């Protein structure tokens, strides 16, 4: 089970986008996530007449390591780490600071 999953709201802890908030769009491998509006790079693309794509500079979302992001706790309004707790025989993600279950 992953502590940070797709559609979680996260805050960036380090790097050029420190403090930015965004939603996880997808996981890349086990240790990287792509966050909406964070770590955007400019990529040059060639025109392709077969697909009708025009060339130029395109913004591309790049992966960021999961250790550089933390879950956003709406109750406190701050970044929070996630842990796991056994509730009725099921493994549930909880916020480390409050022990409340993470809303999906």
From Swiss-Prot:
Q: List, alphabetically, the GO terms of the cellular component aspect.
A: ribonucleoprotein complex; ribosome
Record CDD domains: KOW_RPL26
Instruction: Drop me one GO molecular function for this one.
Output: structural constituent of ribosome
Q: Which domain of life is it from?
A: Bacteria
Key words of the record: Ribonucleoprotein, Ribosomal protein, RNA-binding, rRNA-binding
Any one Gene Ontology BP term: translation
Q: Which InterPro entries match?
A: Rib_uL2_dom2, Ribosomal_uL24, Ribosomal_uL24_KOW, Translation_prot_SH3-like_sf
The record ties this protein, via Gene3D superfamilies, to: 2.30.30.30
What the record says about family reads: Belongs to the universal ribosomal protein uL24 family.
Subunit description = Part of the 50S ribosomal subunit.
Q: Which HAMAP family match?
A: Ribosomal_uL24_B
Q: What does this protein do?
A: One of two assembly initiator proteins, it binds directly to the 5'-end of the 23S rRNA, where it nucleates assembly of the 50S subunit.
What name does this protein carry? Large ribosomal subunit protein uL24
Q: In the UniProt record, what gene is named as encoding this protein?
A: rplX
């Amino acid at each position: 089970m992953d502590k940070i999953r797709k559609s979680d709201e996260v805050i960036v802890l380090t790097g050029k986008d420190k403090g930015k908030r965004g939603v996880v769009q997808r996981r890349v491998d086990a240790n990287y996530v792509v966050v909406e509006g964070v770590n955007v790079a400019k990529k040059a693309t060639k025109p392709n007449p077969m697909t009708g794509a025009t060339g130029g500079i395109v913004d591309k979302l790049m992966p960021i390591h999961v250790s550089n992001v933390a879950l956003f706790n709406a109750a406190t309004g701050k970044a929070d780490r996630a842990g796991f707790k056994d509730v009725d025989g099921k493994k549930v993600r909880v916020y480390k600071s409050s022990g409340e279950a993470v809303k999906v």
